[in-house]
Regions:
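A conserved, well-ordered hydrophobic junction motif at loop->secondary-structure transitions
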Residues: 43-79
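Short acidic/polar alpha-helix capping motifs at helix-coil junctions
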Residues: 14-18, 69-70, 84-85, 96-99
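Non-catalytic linker/capping segments at the edges of enzyme domains
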Residues: 1-56
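Short, solvent-exposed coil/turn segments
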Residues: 28, 98-100, 130
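Hydrophobic beta-strand-centered segment that forms part of the acyl-chain substrate-binding groove
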Residues: 75-118
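A generic structural signal for short beta-strands and their flanking turns/coil linkers
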Residues: 16, 31, 40-42, 61, ...
Length: 156
């Protein structure tokens, strides 16, 4: 059973595993992306800074890919916690951290600047240490990119 809402997954990573540029709580120069488990999906929000401009008014595609990457590994960790009956609201750290094995990104529409971006993740499947997550990145209800990640749970 999925939890209604959770603490931010990245805030539950142990300090020694929380330095990622995109989502690490210990990387003050990074994006500080926060992924939340809400029902049976994950959600994150991000407002891109002007320094991430590609063409005028549009977000650089590398940022889109890196947001999907970090949201995907956070989502994978959340879904493993659910499978292992770890209540994210009852722990200070989680024993689960995932890394990217494969990331596929399809760009569907230009991603606008000046708009909060919403990322969503849905569990596709878990097989052993492999976790597949489907994702979307949208702006104002327009899907700008879709992604699929194969994340690997780091060995204990």
């Amino acid at each position: 059973m999925m939890h209604n809402k959770s603490k931010a997954i990245q805030d539950l990573y142990p300090d020694e595993l929380a330095h990622c540029y995109g989502c690490g709580k210990n990387n003050l120069d990074g994006y500080q992306l926060k992924t939340y488990l809400v029902g049976d999906e994950t959600i994150a929000h991000f407002l891109p800074d002007e320094k991430f401009t590609a063409l005028p008014g549009s977000v650089y595609g590398g940022l889109v890919a890196s947001l999907l990457d970090c949201h995907g590994t956070g989502s994978a960790a959340a879904f493993v916690c659910v499978q292992e009956n770890i209540n994210l609201n009852e722990v200070e750290t989680i024993p689960v951290r995932c890394v990217t094995a494969s990331l596929k990104v399809d760009f569907k529409a230009p991603t606008p600047m000046g708009v909060e971006l919403k990322l969503r993740g849905k569990l596709q499947s878990i097989e052993g240490r492999k976790i597949w997550v489907d994702m979307t990145l949208s702006a104002d209800d327009t899907i700008c990119a879709t992604g699929e990640i194969l994340a690997i749970k780091i060995k204990d």
